[in-house]
Regions:
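Surface-exposed, charge/polar-rich loops and edge strands
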Residues: 1-432
Length: 432
């Protein structure tokens, strides 16, 4: 089972600064232009630490500068360490596309690292690639601070866990801030004794990594690097990482990552190749397709996916209704029913059969890329930058946990959670 505990968080002194000017989005979505804007917003914006150069451009000197900057901020009192161990409840509120208010509530705490495997308290759900891990490792080595959390889905019973978590927010928040994406964030800092009931529930079942596989695996590498320093029963801080854990019924929505492809087949030829694996409903135009894919879909209880995939290729728009028998027969026989029911796994089969290569191979040589925006993916086809776009529906968070519980992982870039906790709400120094 996961080992969770309070810790002495490092926070901005909100009494002396405007928190809205100090936060940043997750590092991997910050463009060079946005990074410049964040730096101009406030000299102490967390992007100076989290992304010390444009994404992918940082070198050893940049990481060293980030570490020195953070040390200077601590010395000057810009960031202050909690005097006692605490946990922090984080709530997000936002309006969905229909204008209805949505809410997600999670808990910041410290989680003891452990390797993946049977019986482990931590489970991955997605395959990872190496590049981002090298960058995050260099930053961790230099700063010795977890600057952003790994996000987890709790495996414990949702109703009881949510009740214990929400019992901690029956008072005024300790901090409140709105970010530029329209999300309102509220924080409650809770003492160890106050947090004990919810920590006990969250620790009662394995947790699944929702976002941050690279950061988790980076922390494992960092721990292995320091293993020779371990002394007997010592409990070094580098044995832990910063976690943000959501009960299944309190998490942000798990949204789809669409596939965009360059190359043949395309148009009618592509749709003909898809026919053995799905019923094909042709639509009038891409506008109709985007409206259909934006419409909510109601899943049957326990279903992993809708079975609906949108396709736009050389002016041809269609909705596929996946034939689970046909696609399931081409997946590994040992896969769980939960994995076989995932739309993204059905799409892996469809791409492989239509194009003759798997998605990972096509991504590696530049023939396939990913988009979080369905309209942007379709526009790339309209502008002839790509030959086809495959659009997916969102999946339930419970399906992610189900696949992870079976010891399986989803394809790379299967999903993402949005909105996100901004970087800078709190940090976890690798110290006690």
């Amino acid at each position: 089972m996961p080992n969770l505990r309070p810790f002495r968080a490092l926070r901005y002194d909100v009494a002396a600064a405007d928190l809205s000017k100090l936060l940043a989005p997750p590092y991997d979505i910050i463009s060079p232009a946005e990074r410049r804007e964040l730096l101009a917003r406030d000299a102490h914006n967390i992007v100076r630490i989290e992304l010390p150069a444009d994404l992918g451009a940082a070198g050893a000197a940049d990481y060293a500068t980030a570490a020195a900057t953070l040390d200077a901020w601590r010395e000057a009192g810009v960031m202050v360490k909690d005097p006692e161990p605490t946990v922090t409840v984080h709530e997000m509120r936002w309006l969905d596309a229909e204008g209805s208010e949505q809410r997600a509530t999670g808990l910041f705490c410290r989680l003891r690292l452990e390797e993946y495997g049977p019986g482990a308290g931590v489970r991955p759900h997605e395959q990872t690639h190496g590049g981002p891990k090298a960058d995050r490792y260099a930053l961790l080595q230099a700063t010795q601070v977890n600057t952003s959390p790994v996000v987890f889905l709790a495996g414990s019973e949702p109703a009881a866990t949510s009740a214990a978590l929400l019992a901690l927010v029956d008072r005024m928040p300790d901090a409140e801030v709105a970010t530029t994406d329209g999300v309102r964030h509220r924080l409650w800092i809770c003492a160890e004794a106050e947090a004990a009931p919810v920590l006990a529930l969250l620790s009662a079942a394995p947790v699944t990594i929702a976002d941050g596989h690279h950061r988790y695996e980076t922390a494992l590498r960092y721990r292995a690097h320091h293993a020779a320093e371990r002394r007997g029963d010592a409990d070094p801080a580098w044995d832990h990482l910063l976690a943000l854990i959501y009960p299944l019924d309190q998490s942000p929505p798990a949204l789809p990552t669409h596939r965009v492809i360059r190359g043949r087949p395309c148009g009618d030829e592509l749709l003909e190749r898809l026919a053995p694996y799905a019923a094909i409903e042709r639509l009038a135009d891409v506008k109709t397709l985007l409206a259909r894919m934006a419409a909510p879909v109601h899943l049957t209880p326990g279903a992993s996916g809708s079975g609906r995939i949108g396709v736009f290729t050389h002016g041809k728009a269609a909705v596929l209704s996946v034939d689970r028998v046909a696609t399931g027969a081409l997946l590994d026989a040992g896969l769980s029913e939960g994995s076989k029911g995932l739309d993204v796994n059905a799409l892996e089969v469809i791409i492989r059969r239509a194009f003759g290569d798997d998605a990972a191979t096509m991504a590696a040589d530049g023939r396939l890329w990913y988009s979080k925006d369905a309209a942007a993916a379709a526009t790339q086809v309209q502008d002839e930058e790509a030959s086809a776009a495959f659009l997916l529906d969102a999946m339930p968070a419970a399906a992610i946990s189900l696949v992870a519980a079976a010891g399986e992982v989803m394809p790379h870039k299967s999903t993402y959670f949005n909105p996100n906790a901004p970087t800078g709400l709190l940090l976890s120094p690798l110290e006690w």
